[in-house]
Amino acid sequence: MGGKSANKAGYFDKLKGLLEEYKSIFIVSVDNVSSQQMHEIRQALRDQGVVLMGKNTMVRRALKTFLVDSPEYERLLPFVKGNVGFVFTNGDLKEIRDKILANKVAAPARAGAVAPVDVWIPAGNTGMEPGKTSFFQALGVPTKIARGTIEITTDLKLVEAGAKVGPSEATLLNMLNISPFTYGMGIAQVYDQGNTFPSSVLDISEEQLLKAFSSAITTIAAVSLALNFPTLPSVIHSLVNSYKKVLAVAIETEISWPEIEELKDRIANPEAYAAAAPVAAADSGAAAGGAAAEEEKEEEEESDEEGGFGDLFG
């Protein structure tokens, strides 16, 4: 009894120490993960993360004792179910996620196992003797005899994802040397500084965030303007619209201020401004031409001076 209490206290202390040392946790599913895979994952995460396994009842009990000082740990409790473990890290979450998921091994189908994906049998020659044709027929696999061997004529989905693999299906897959499943750690949830979220969030790029943020600002501004309810994104648009209205009123009335006089004059005398535009352009061109001529004249004078010096020393 004393040994169990000591083990429990030791586990509580270890879990508490890891929670205090690391800011991020991957809650990982370890169904069908072999001890060899677990060892390889620990090696891959060396100096970057720590893997901790434990009975769910003990983990939940430990977390509940920590809630008084750290209530944010309550967010972990809903995910402590099934065959799960913890990976603690302070590293880059996307990099650690990829290392956790990288260790996958192909596995043969076992009778009674739930298929995580659809299992297909590809068309092609099996190399098996015709005597086993009845076995294929019993499972509904289309075959023919070609050059003294059994040939599967079309691709066939043998087991659907989520269904249990039957004894006959498992036997056939093993006969064909097909290992349809891959097993490794999966990620149930990510905990980071008091927040929990699915690992797919780690794939959201900065460009996507900026696009979503920009779209949200545009929507808020549009709704605010429609409701005539000022918000930070809509204020600039409201000011511009209001100023346009003030200009419209000033143009139609005797209200005036220095900045509006030129606009009123442009509206009243458009021909004068239209005629002034080509003159301004011509003046600009003449000025540019004059500058070019002046520069050319200076170059000629410099050339003459150089010639004079040549005669002097010749």
Swiss-Prot record:
One of its GO terms (molecular function) is structural constituent of ribosome. The modification Phosphoserine is found at S303. One of its GO terms (cellular component) is cytosolic large ribosomal subunit. Keywords: Phosphoprotein, Ribonucleoprotein, Ribosomal protein. Residues 285-314 are annotated as: Disordered. Phosphorylated. SUPFAM superfamilies: Ribosomal protein L10-like. Residues 293-308 have a biased composition (Acidic residues). GO terms for biological process: cytoplasmic translation; ribosomal large subunit assembly. Ribosomal protein P0 is the functional equivalent of E.coli protein L10. PANTHER family: 60S ACIDIC RIBOSOMAL PROTEIN P0, LARGE RIBOSOMAL SUBUNIT PROTEIN UL10. Component of the large ribosomal subunit. P0 forms a pentameric complex by interaction with dimers of P1 and P2. Belongs to the universal ribosomal protein uL10 family. This is Large ribosomal subunit protein uL10. It comes from Podospora anserina.
